[in-house]
Regions:
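C-terminal and inter-domain tail/linker signature
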Residues: 1-132
Length: 132
């Protein structure tokens, strides 16, 4: 049961400091990742994606709203924020959730992100504020 608590606690800590110093050891080497923009396999590709966010986005932040484990599945609800490196530096927000599946060794073998908005909604945030 200690391992069960550890992965949830590790994920909570990773969300708090996202995208800095993520704990990649909780992922299987061949982890499957999918979100509305990407679909790939492998922890190295996952590391590259997180490094891209860390390098090119301004002030990225992940607010964790909830985390729940049921059997071999962990569900998180979150909002990802960042400023895009455009001259007017718009603040972007993507609310969503993740479904993480664990193997028998308690490693994440599947990480699928879902957004509560469309890709077009994200593009629009770069040019229109909610007050317009």
């Amino acid at each position: 049961m200690n391992i069960v608590m550890n992965i949830v606690e590790t994920l909570k800590q990773d969300y708090q400091r996202f995208p800095i110093n993520q704990t990649y050891s909780i992922y299987a080497d061949d982890v499957y990742f999918q979100d509305p923009l990407n679909k790939f396999r492998g922890v190295q590709r996952y590391k590259q994606m997180i490094k891209f966010i860390e390098t090119f986005f301004i002030d990225p932040k992940m607010d964790l709203h909830s985390i729940e484990r049921l059997g071999d599945t962990i569900k998180t609800e979150w909002t990802l924020h960042w400023n895009t490196p455009l001259p007017w530096k718009p603040r972007i927000s993507i609310p969503g959730w993740s479904e993480l599946r664990l193997n028998a060794e308690e490693l994440i073998v599947s990480h699928i992100d879902y957004w509560n908005c469309s890709r077009l909604d994200v593009v629009k945030q770069h040019f229109f504020t909610k007050n317009n």
